[in-house]
Amino acid sequence: RYSDGVFQKNIENNAFANRIKSFIDIGAFPEYALEHEIELTPVDLCADCIIKILEHSSKCNMFHLYNPNLLSVKLLYDVLRKEFDINLVPLSNRLLSYMITGILQDEKNKKILSGIIYDLDNDKNLIYTSKIKLNADFTNAYLNEIGFHWKKIDEDYIVKYMNYFKKIKFINIDKE
C-alpha cells in the first residue's frame, strides 16, 4: 500500500519482490537497468482509482489501470544505498553472467537466484527490456477529468516498502 508500504500477504509469490531479494542477496544487478523505470501500482491507490471511476458514469466500461508515474531504477538503487546501506554493484551483462554461473554451481547458495532464474536467457544474461509499450493515455485523461491523479512513487514510498520487507523478515537489510 502506498500509505504504509504494507505488501501482499503472499509476498514470496510476487516477482518484483523476489527480484529485489535476489539482487540484494547477490550484491549485484544489471548495470543497464539503471537507465530504466519500473511500474508499481500500490493496491490502495488502485482501489481509490476504481472507487473514483465508480462514482462517475461513463460510456466507457473498460479502463487500463496502472500508475503511469514510473519508478526510476536509479532512484531505487540510490535509496537502497543511502537509507539501508545496501551495497549493490551494477555489473555488465558479462560479469553478472559469470557471477550467476558461479552461484548456480554452488548447491548451498544457488537458491538466492530464485527471484531471477526465469529472467535468464541461455547465456545467463538477465533480460529486462521489452518492445511492448504500455499505453493508458485514454484512461489517464479520463481519470484527470474526474479528479483522480496518481501519486508519484518516491523515496518515502521505497523506504516504507523496504521497511515492511525488513519487518516481515523477507529481506535482511539491517545496518551492521
Task: Give the role of each language-model region.
Residues I38-C46:
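A conserved structural motif in NAD(P)-dependent oxidoreductases
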Residues R1, A28-E39, S58-Y66, N122-K124, ...:
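Glycine- and acidic
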Residues L40, L70, K133:
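Short aromatic/basic micro-patch
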Residues C49-D123, F165-I168, N172-E176:
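Mid/C-terminal beta-alpha module of Rossmann-like enzyme folds, strongest
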Residues R1-E37, L71-S72:
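Flexible, glycine-rich beta-alpha linker
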Residues L120-T129, L134, T139:
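A conserved mid-domain beta-alpha-beta active-site/ligand-binding segment of alpha/beta enzyme cores
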Residues K133-E176:
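Amphipathic terminal alpha-helices
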